[in-house]
Amino acid sequence: MSAQQPQHSKYGFSKTIDVPYEEAIEKARAALKEEGFGVLSEIDIKEKLKEKLGVDFRRYVILGACNPALAYETLQEEIDIGLLLPCNVIVYEQDGRTVVSAVDAAKMLSVVGNPKLESTASMVNEKLRRVIDSL
């Protein structure tokens, strides 16, 4: 099984892996749990697009992940931060492989403009990077 080195985009980091889609979702869930995140929501984009628009789309899921302690810390500092929570992790199929990506919390929280959130955002990113790296 070969895996690509993690990639970084403008707003997240990802890794393409040679693991079946369903297995990648389970591995991502397990890795998130290891880092103290719970999955609060799971949105099956393929299913929703078929249901709402009647269109076919690749298999694609959004996992809404939350680390309660870090979320609480952030909410204490910025009550409206809930608009940017939870941290999304996506899993989708591409060219016969599976891509797993996580949001860059530092970039996302930078829109708030509160320097007190920088250390928490860095901590979240470290955890999410470990999730992606472990796959």
Model-flagged regions — what are they?
Residues 111-135:
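Well-ordered alpha/beta subsegment
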Residues 26-27, 44, 77, 123, ...:
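Short Gly/charged-rich anion-binding patches and loops
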Residues 34, 38-90:
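Compact, glycine-rich, soluble single-domain proteins
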Residues 18-20, 66, 92, 103:
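Solvent-exposed residues in well-ordered beta-strands and their adjoining turns
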Residues 83-95, 132-135:
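Short secondary-structure transition/capping segments
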Residues 88-114:
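Beta-strand/loop substructures that line and gate deep hydrophobic ligand-binding cavities in soluble
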Residues 2-36:
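Terminal, regulation- and interaction-focused segments at domain boundaries
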